[in-house]
Regions:
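Short, solvent-exposed loop/turn segments enriched in Ser/Thr/Gly
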Residues: 381-387, 428, 442-447
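Intrinsically disordered, low-complexity Pro/Gly/Ser/Thr-rich segments with frequent PxxP/GP/PP motifs
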Residues: 413-438
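Membrane-embedded alpha-helical bundles of multi-pass integral membrane proteins
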Residues: 2-249, 301, 314-346
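Terminal connector regions
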Residues: 436-472
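Asparagine-centered strand-capping/turn motif at beta-strand->loop junctions
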Residues: 390-394
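Hydrophobic alpha-helical transmembrane segments in integral membrane proteins
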Residues: 350-374
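Cysteine-centered iron-sulfur cluster-binding motifs in ferredoxin-type domains/subunits
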Residues: 102-117, 211-226, 261-308
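Short acidic, flexible loop segments centered on an aromatic residue
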Residues: 395-410
């Protein structure tokens, strides 16, 4: 059974032709109230993105995700693999936030905050307008033969795109290996850091491919967030929507005619100018309703408002609204489902904040040496050998470290007399614990150990002490 002509858009995407070839999108340069606000938000976020790797707090990079060395800085606070439980909680909160936010506000994130949209629409697209001109000029340039003008414009655009992609790749690398290390590599030159330079070129090629060729296909094909809409959106979700009740009315949309009483004639307020289609960065017609390709960028809102103002009709034909708002002309309602998500999200955030505040400055792990049994000492004393690992999560050296038994009478002998843990480093070694066997209750006893810096207790940990089966 074939779909009606009006429903064809539901069975295909706007960026692919009927014969399966790429349909290049040439959106008209947007302008308007929402676009101006998006520029402010976008350039603010871009500024944060580009300067964050070079900001230091207490000697720590503001944000660093060094997977190779397993060192992470979030807002200037160092995190280690031992803090992985915090990452799990954060990811869980992030997933729930995406669900909660999408249920309530659709893909507003995509249009306002997503790095792909910001770079594509506020950086690369604006460069394209500057070099090649607006929609009409770009279409004519694409159809034109490869003459001197076309070669000149395309080469200039490709060079500028490559330079910006290279710059983005450098910033991306600064997040991965640290800005200090990146600057050192740049001063030394690629000759001495060939693997890093090759990685930089690979990142550059990926960014260039995404923004020069793949472009809006990322949002339409590659990004899983768009696919979630079908599961998460309902008729109460706020999206960029066309008010079909007002736009169509009894006789549907029609071209604008001066001095015509559209209300009396039963014509809708939509004058079928197609400006909302021409300005769309993914090439859809928002009048067909919510679609997979829509990133809620508001370009169609600005274009429609501009046309409504010119023809003397009320603005808001395309606006932020839900299906229920348009159908029943009601206001946004905080549904029980949203309330449930909010409660769960609030609890998880409270747990995460609590765990961050209770996070210790030092991580201690003391484990019995594998394959080693206990050893009899003088009198009734039993000795076990252990390995210790101390991770200093702070920017200060921890000096004069000592170990003391808190749960049993006995003593601890460290192989190295002096233990110091440098800032953001770890210290490892061996120690012996000696306890009177008469104090042991089981074959394997839990013992509590205190780690001190001078006389100050900085951490406690437990380990298993092995003794004989009989204590008589």
């Amino acid at each position: 059974m074939k779909s009606p002509e009006a429903e064809v858009f539901r069975d295909s995407i706007s960026t692919v032709t009927q014969d399966g070839k790429r349909a290049w999108i040439f959106p008209k340069k947007p302008s308007g109230r929402y676009y101006n606000w998006r520029k402010i938000v976008s350039y603010f976020l871009l500024t944060i993105l580009f300067i964050s790797p070079f900001i230091k707090i207490n000697g720590n990079q503001f944000i660093m995700i060094n997977v190779l060395e397993r060192r992470f800085n979030i807002f200037g606070q160092p995190f280690w693999p031992q803090d992985f439980h915090l990452v799990v909680i954060s990811m869980l909160i992030g997933v729930l936030f995406v669900v909660f936010f999408t249920v309530a506000y659709g893909r507003i994130f995509c249009g306002w905050i997503c790095p792909q949209t910001i770079f594509m629409e506020m950086v690369f697209r604006r460069i394209e307008y500057w070099i090649e001109g607006d929609r009409g000029k770009q279409i004519r340039l694409k159809k034109a033969p490869w003459n001197a003008e076309k070669i000149k414009k395309r080469v200039i655009k490709w060079i500028v795109f490559f330079i910006i992609s290279f710059l983005i790749a450098n910033v991306f690398l600064a997040y991965l290996i640290g800005s200090d290390q990146l600057l050192k590599y740049m001063i030394d030159g690629p000759k001495y850091h060939l693997s890093t330079f090759i990685s930089l070129l690979i990142f550059t090629a990926v960014f260039y491919f995404v923004f020069a060729w793949f472009r809006e296909q990322v949002c339409v094909i590659a990004c899983p967030y768009g696919r979630l809409q079908g599961v998460l959106l309902d008729n109460k979700s706020i999206v960029v929507a066309y008010d079909y009740k007002r736009g169509e009315k009894e006789k549907g949309r029609a071209k604008f005619k001066k001095s015509e009483n559209r209300e009396a004639s039963g014509k809708g307020d939509c004058i079928d100018c197609a400006q909302c289609v021409h300005v769309c960065p993914t090439g859809i017609d928002i009048r067909n309703g919510t679609q997979l390709e829509c990133v809620n960028c508001t370009a169609c809102i600005d274009a429609c408002d501009s046309m409504m103002e010119k023809v003397g009709l009320p603005k808001g034909l395309i606006r932020y609204a839900s299906e229920e708002n348009i159908e029943k002309k009601t206001k946004f309602e905080f549904t029980p489902r949203l309330k449930g998500y909010s409660v769960v999200l609030g609890v998880l955030i409270a747990v995460l904040v609590g765990m961050l505040f209770l996070r210790n400055d030092i991580e201690a792990r003391i484990l019995r040496l594998p394959g080693q049994l206990y050893e009899h000492k003088e009198g009734s004393n039993i000795s076990n050998v252990f390995t210790y690992k101390l991770v200093n999560k702070t920017t200060q050296n921890i000096e004069d470290v000592s170990f003391k038994l808190l749960s049993h009478d006995g003593f601890i002998k460290v192989v190295n007399d002096e233990v110091n843990v440098p800032a953001q480093e770890l210290a490892e070694g061996t120690l012996f614990i000696e306890i009177d066997s008469n104090l042991l209750k089981e074959e394997k006893d839990k013992v509590e150990i205190g780690i001190y810096s001078g006389s100050h207790l900085i951490e406690t940990t437990t380990t298993t002490f092995l003794g004989p089966r009989s204590f008589n």
